[in-house]
Every structure is written in C-alpha cells, then in structure tokens.
Amino acid sequence: MGVAATGSGQVPSAVTASPISFNADTGTLNAVIFNTTSDITQKSNVTEITDAVSIIDKLQGVEFDLTLYGTKSAGVIAQALETVLPHLVSTDHNGIKSVNYAGLTGYLIEAIKELGRNR
C-alpha cells in the first residue's frame, strides 16, 4: 500500500487525535510516533552485531543545510554510509539516496555496550 501526496495536508487517524501531516513545501512528514516492524516472526538469519565500535568509528555525523529547503539538519551522508553499511542505504529511481536511520540503532546499542565493557 502506498500514499501519494499531491500537496500539503493531514491524514486523520481513527485511533488517536494526532494526525499524520505532510508539508509538500518542506518535504516534512510529522507524526507522534514512527514504528518500524521488528517482530522476530518477520526476521530470518538473525546474528549478533560484533565489533560495533569499529563500525561506528568509520561513520561521520555531520550537520548540514538541506539545499531544497534551506533548513538545518544533522545526520550522515548516504554515500559515505553506503561504503560501510550498504544495506542501510536505498536509491530511488532518480538516483537520490536515503538512509534507514532506524537500522543504525542496533549498531549504536552494541557500540555503547562495547564501550561500557571496556571502561
């Protein structure tokens, strides 16, 4: 299922009083909570993340201005992330890359745990 937006607006929710809103001018999608499916029944080949600090050390967090909207943001550069964790980067039909930031969470959790063990 997909949702096509031809302009700004809101998608009302039958469950909560907080709708999903989309601003076509800024490319901003807002919701109270974004969930990512994480149920074990939907996964296969589950393995532990090892050497997470080494992986995270190869990444660079950056601040930047979004050229299309002129707004300040922070994150990673998809092309740089792709050299380290290519499965967290997608490329659309125009060649524009996007990042699965939720996918970084497991690496960050394990890196923090590794750092804690090494204190």
Predicted regions and their residues:
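Small/polar residue-rich beta-strand/coil "junction" motifs that cap repeat-based extracellular fibers
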Residues: 5-7, 13-44
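Short helix-capping/linker segments at secondary-structure and domain boundaries
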Residues: 6-12, 113-119
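C-terminal intramolecular chaperone/autoprocessing and neck/assembly modules of extracellular spikes
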Residues: 29-101, 111, 115-118
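Assembly/interface hotspot detector across virion components, adhesins/toxins, and nucleic-acid enzymes
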Residues: 1, 20, 89-90
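Short acidic, glycine-rich loop/turn motifs
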Residues: 3-7, 66-68
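Conserved, well-structured core segments
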Residues: 1-3, 106
